[in-house]
């Protein structure tokens, strides 16, 4: 599931939708609208997962296609729900 992929690969930096490396670049909808190339869209989230940026590594070739899709969907859904007020 997307939650499992996130927990196993992303949560060390993005615990509860936050960001321990770059404060402010959290995984809330409003924050992603500001800093993510393409804004808060599944396409923009997937691009970031695949290619990385700055200190975030690229996950293409590490995660398989289904894992990339699952974690993209998970981040997208959490961003406007439980992580809406992430800091």
Curated annotation (Swiss-Prot):
It comes from the Eukaryota. Signal peptide: none annotated. Heme c binds at residues 10, 13-14, 56. GO terms for molecular function: electron transfer activity; heme binding; iron ion binding. GO terms for cellular component: chloroplast thylakoid lumen. The keyword Glycoprotein does not apply. Binds 1 heme c group covalently per subunit. Pfam families: Cytochrome_CBB3. Keywords: Chloroplast, Electron transport, Heme, Iron, Metal-binding, Photosynthesis, Plastid, Thylakoid, Transport. Functions as an electron carrier between membrane-bound cytochrome b6-f and photosystem I in oxygenic photosynthesis. Belongs to the cytochrome c family. PetJ subfamily. Monomer. This is Cytochrome c6. It comes from Euglena viridis.
């Amino acid at each position: 599931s997307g939650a499992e992929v996130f927990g196993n690969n992303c949560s060390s930096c993005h615990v509860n939708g936050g960001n321990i490396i770059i404060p402010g670049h959290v995984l809330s909808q409003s924050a992603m609208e500001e800093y993510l190339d393409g804004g808060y869209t599944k396409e923009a989230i997937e691009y970031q997962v695949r290619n990385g940026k700055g200190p975030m590594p690229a996950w293409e070739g590490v995660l398989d296609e289904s894992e990339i899709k699952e974690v993209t969907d998970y981040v997208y859904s959490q961003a406007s729900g439980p992580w809406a007020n992430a800091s």
